Amino acid sequence: MESSEPEPTEDASMDAFLEKFQSQPYRGGFREDQWEEEFDKIPLFMKKAPSEIDPEEFPDLACLQSMIFDDDRYPEEQAKTYKDEGNDYFKEKDYKKAVLSYSEGLKKKCADPDLNAVLYTNRAAAQYYLGNVRSSLNDVLAAKKLKPGHLKAIIRGALCHLELKHFAEAVNWCDEGLQIDAKEKKLLEIRAKADKLKRMEERDLRKAKLKEKKEQHQNEALLQAIKARNIRLVSESAGEDEDSASNGPAEILLDGLSSENPYGARLSIDDQGRLSWPVLFLYPEYAQSDFISAFHEDTRFIDHLMAMFSEAPSWDSEHKYHPENLEVYFEDEDRAELYQVSPDSTLLQVLQHPRCCVKALTPAFLVCVGSSPFCRNYLQGKKVHR
């Protein structure tokens, strides 16, 4: 009977081989301290491909890439390869590279309309996440042209219109998609949101139109009131005086009646048809000013002066600005002349003066202490009508 045990010569050979293997390290293998880095250089086990593939550093990967993107392959195969590459970038949220890959796939101009529709739709999604909503919508339209019933393209188009605040269009796209799949959850959600926003937009538009109509009626009433009082107006940018009585205020300052001045006030009319003006008081001695947001036309100047100077303002260090000491003037800019205003005059009486002109719908008056040296010097050389 033959023995199954190896002959002594075979055992000796195996022992010699193992001793040699242990004493001489395996050349070309991974180093113990760098095995992870070396492992990551093998294409099959790479966690992430390098952005730039150097054939000398990554020869295996460069070889695979040349095989994958071989121009000798059919356009459909190349386009699909770029589509898959774009999908990988998309999953990594690298949307810029995804756009580039999908674009390369479209450049192949393959004859498969479904594949091209997918490339357009996928690129639209990447563009959307990059914030290029109009580019995304253009791609969706191209995909829809190739494949009208492409549901993903319709969903993306609805999202684009929603983002662009085209709420009615978003609803229409959703309705089109729901004809294909009436239970599509995403379309139902988009439609509900778009319809709600569309209704809000329509409501706001109605409110804006009502407000505009109300303001138009108010402006017409203001214009009629100004014209009836023969008050002269001049626009802020006008080079020459524009008389409201002769030229017609509607042609002069219709837009100005609807706008506030820099202080946030505007000309108004009450239920009795009486006007209240924003008025500016200027104190040239101290380069100071006061603004009255609503100076009623039937109120006297002295009434406002008493209220403003019941206590000395912080800039009146000499405490000389008392109502009984103050003189008020308006300027005739055309003639460079000043007209003194009686403190007992109402605003309307002054505005109806033949030489008083209201600039930018805000009457302005100069105020100074009549007995002060500054006032005498300031008025010196000027023609003053008292």
Curated annotation (Swiss-Prot):
Organism this protein belongs to = Mus musculus (Mouse)
Protein's UniProt keywords contain Cytoplasm: yes
Q: Which family does it belong to?
A: Belongs to the TTC4 family.
Coiled-coil ranges per the record?
Answer: none
> Which function does this protein serve?
May act as a co-chaperone for HSP90AB1.
Which keywords has UniProt assigned to this entry? Acetylation, Antiviral defense, Cytoplasm, Immunity, Innate immunity, Nucleus, Phosphoprotein, Repeat, TPR repeat
Q: Which gene encodes it?
A: Ttc4
Q: Which InterPro entries match?
A: Csn1/TTC4_wheel, TPR-like_helical_dom_sf, TPR_rpt
Q: What is this protein called?
A: Tetratricopeptide repeat protein 4
